[in-house]
């Protein structure tokens, strides 16, 4: 019997992620119009993997509605992304890792695709700025 069977977690409640048999959560997404996939990373929590998927999905697809996302309240639908798949991959991975690092609750959040600052409340009831802007990770590179 594996971990998922013993805990009753054979399937995730979040879209775009899966659990490895050793317990890590992973996420990847297809690049529209290609057969390519972007590996978004391996995460300690399902929420971290799901946020990474949301950021990448939003940046790649620019959906009219955020209802298809795992955490629709975390992204601002008015932002537009004009970034490369590699930069989207980096922003998504960093957003997921930030969630894994102990970020618990969002108080005012924008997409990881735009040039915005995001505020999260951590487990110590403090509000700290967390910038998950893709442009910060690029250092001025890979803009489309």
UniProtKB/Swiss-Prot annotation:
GO biological process: cellular response to water deprivation; ethylene-activated signaling pathway; response to fungus
One GO MF term attached to the UniProt entry: DNA-binding transcription factor activity
Compartments, as annotated in UniProt: Nucleus
Keywords for the protein's UniProt record, in alphabetical order: Activator, DNA-binding, Ethylene signaling pathway, Nucleus, Transcription, Transcription regulation
Major place of residence: nucleus
GO CC field: cytoplasm; nucleus
Entry annotated with the keyword Nucleus: yes
Family: Belongs to the AP2/ERF transcription factor family. ERF subfamily.
Stated name of the protein: Ethylene-responsive transcription factor ERF019
Organism of provenance: Arabidopsis thaliana
Organism placement in taxonomy: Eukaryota, Viridiplantae, Streptophyta, Embryophyta, Tracheophyta
Gene name as annotated: ERF019
